[in-house]
Amino acid sequence: LVDPAVADSLQPALAAGLDGVTVRFERFGGECTHAEIDRITAAAATPGSAAEVIVAMGGGKTIDTAKAAAIRTGARMVIVPTIASTDAPCSAVAVVYDAHGVFAETLRFSRNPDTVVMDPDVIVAAPPRFFAAGIGDALSTFFEARSNAESRTDNYVAGGFPRTLAGLAIAETCQAVLRRDGIKAMIAVRAGLCTTAVENIIEANTLLSGLGFENCGCSAAHGIHDALTRLDETHGLLHG
């Protein structure tokens, strides 16, 4: 499943790397809706040629759609993010919207993606605002984790189980990396450079934030975000 924004530039390289493997490319429809999930599920479950692996190449909504389809079909999940704008790649959840971009629900899955592959050069080549949005999303991880810990709120993301100390430690590390390397990384990304700080922020935006929110839960920041999606003026804004 390929995001149309990167299909022309990245799809040929992906196809070449999968020489000898039967591959079918589907272009993402632009919104993670139930209808789009149904469409991709049907494509992946075609009788006689059902997909063994679903690969998602693109941003968070492309990734969430592919994850939902993989869960429905039993296929393995390989995630290839082309931007570091959210912590969707590593998580076992998908955020579903309606056709107008209004938040509908969050789907929770029984398993996480099998593999996440990120090329820092691809991330740096994307518009810097996506990288900044990923920092914004990841910045909420520690504060929401701490909020849940201090209020002794169970982790609803994980079905009501208590938080883990390891999860809270990861959320704290995520925050520390963002504060230490965030500004340096943004300067580098705007200059088109891949530096150690950039690679650290890619890890924080994607892995540390993903593990942090799944093991500690979300709180006010994401609740306010979900409500704001009901305003038409917010539909062009990024999640972070």
Regions found by a protein language model. Name each.
Residues 7-10, 34-37, 61-67, 86-90, ...:
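Short glycine/serine/threonine-rich phosphate/pyrophosphate-binding segments
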Residues 71-166:
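A glycine/threonine-rich phosphate-anchoring loop and its flanking beta-alpha core
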Residues 155-240:
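Active-site segments that bind and position negatively charged phosphate/pyrophosphate groups
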Residues 13, 39, 43, 68, ...:
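Alpha-helical scaffold segments in soluble metabolic enzymes
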Residues 1-53:
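ATP/NTP phosphate-donor binding region
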